[in-house]
Amino acid sequence: MCYGKIISMKKVMMFIICLFLCGCSSASSSRKVYNEYVDTLKGVKEEKMCSGIEVTFKVDEITEDYINYYALINRNGNVMKNIQALLIHDKETINSFPSIGIYDEDVSLINEEDKIGVKLSGYLEVNENTIFKLLLKYVDKDNVKKECYYIYNYQHN
């Protein structure tokens, strides 16, 4: 009877170890994708817009020293499945860049009842000029993969 409990305990321990290792692998994979997207965006020199998708950049000064920046992705009724997006800027920071669908589950906007879009938002110290770049990937209603790049040059007054 004691022998059976030991085997059960070993199975439980092996299961916990497997879950832990799978979780670490997933985080490592997400980090790799995130870094690849950052590198891709750093190399982008011009926009490649997705037809029917509207992207709006906004910057609000929240204090004398900090701004809140965000990109609003409006799907305009289009089907957007498995959305992945990353918003970067050209300033040095210790913070990670806002993203969706990379570290968390992909978002899909399919039905009319779904939200009209996605918002990526972050905070940054005030600078005279900041260049923001957005990478947007998704699958459309015909299951065609789309990849788009948007650029916004912010001028502080």
Language-model region placement:
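Short, solvent-exposed, Trp/other aromatic-anchored flexible loops in extracytoplasmic proteins
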Residues: 94-148
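Beta-strand elements of well-folded, non-transmembrane domains
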Residues: 59-61, 73-77, 89-91, 122-124, ...
